[in-house]
Amino acid sequence: MGDKTKVQVSKLKPGRYIIIDGEPCRIVNVTVSSPGKHGSAKARIEAVGIFDGKVRSIVKPTSAEVDVPIIDKRVGQIIAITPDTVQLMDMETYETFDVPIEGGVDDEVKGQLTEGITVEYWETLGRIQIKKIRGE
């Protein structure tokens, strides 16, 4: 899988995803400035990083193309928890891997992780983050 694709700036909306400075981000706001007599319309895109939570913004012409991440949303089971990593097993492929707690676990679920529970995790651009706990 390519992990990213190209999309025209004019097609972007809040709630969608974009790659800014190599970091996948969720778009919070898109404002388009009307062009003057000569020139093209510009879009200001404000977004929040999926992994680090930092606010980023870019300004691009609406006719330009930007990279958009392909996010693979999967289900896994927590096998073990160490002080700095979580060992996760994919429920479809039964592949196991380690996810760092810092940056790899969403802040909302950090305190709720226990061994044996089922979680939803996102994989994009070679990085993994546990997003939420699944109810069985």
UniProtKB/Swiss-Prot annotation:
Belongs to the eIF-5A family. This is Translation initiation factor 5A. Functions by promoting the formation of the first peptide bond. It holds the Pfam family IF5A-like_N. One of its GO terms (biological process) is translational elongation. InterPro entries: IF5A-like (IPR001884), IF5A-like_N (IPR048670), NA-bd_OB-fold (IPR012340), Rib_uL2_dom2 (IPR014722), Trans_elong_IF5A_hypusine_site (IPR019769), Transl_elong_IF5A_arc (IPR022847), Transl_elong_IF5A_C (IPR020189), Translation_prot_SH3-like_sf (IPR008991). It is found in: Cytoplasm. The modification Hypusine is found at residue 37. One of its GO terms (molecular function) is RNA binding. It comes from Thermococcus kodakarensis (strain ATCC BAA-918 / JCM 12380 / KOD1). HAMAP family: eIF_5A.
